[in-house]
Amino acid sequence: VKACRLENGEIDWTGLDVYIGVDLAETTDNCAVVMVAYVDGVVYCEPLAFIPEARTDEKSATERVDYRHFIKQMQCVACGDRVVDYAVIEEYVMKIEEQYGVKIIDIGYDRRNAMSSAQKWERAGYNVTEVEQHSRTLHAPTKLLKECILNHQFLYKANELYEINYQNAKCTEDTNKNKYVNKKRSAGKVDMVVATIIAVYIMQQHEIFDTGLDWGIQTA
């Protein structure tokens, strides 16, 4: 993924339609919000991680990741005490349009930990879509993301923490050869990758398939 890194300067997001992917995980763990846009066949990406502030040094030691450095680099936000403060994440998402000059088309989320936040965004007037965390749903955006990266059709501002997430990520195949990032089998934190895949899924539905959101609930 490093080959897709924008070494100097910023991505100009002004006027773009964007899609937000949210992985809130557990409140004691890392969370991530990722914004993507699809422009002339290229996926633009802006990731941000969130961690519990009081666990910053503990996580840095156990994960061998210098979170204080990444906080200074504005690649990570420390909030809350020993659990992530979801209110900080909710407010960040609701300020994206003003901060970047974009139009949020849809916000994708995993229902396990984000139902309350999604309801708040919906009440604030945003479109929100639950993205099922199942291989049959995640295979297509995972495949598209991989292809965009390999073809250098993916662009993000230099972000070492984001790259570490990719190094940690391990893909698994189900019995139907559907590939997805498996958190349990990954070597470390992959929340920013998962949030990217959620955002790409939403983007794919609107920009590429344009057939409406169609997904099923896994009951077993």
Q: Where are the model-predicted features located?
A:
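Short, surface-exposed amphipathic charged segments that create phosphate/polyanion-binding patches used
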Residues: 142-151
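RNase H-like, metal-dependent nuclease domains and their acidic two-metal-ion catalytic environment used
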Residues: 1-133, 139, 143, 156-220
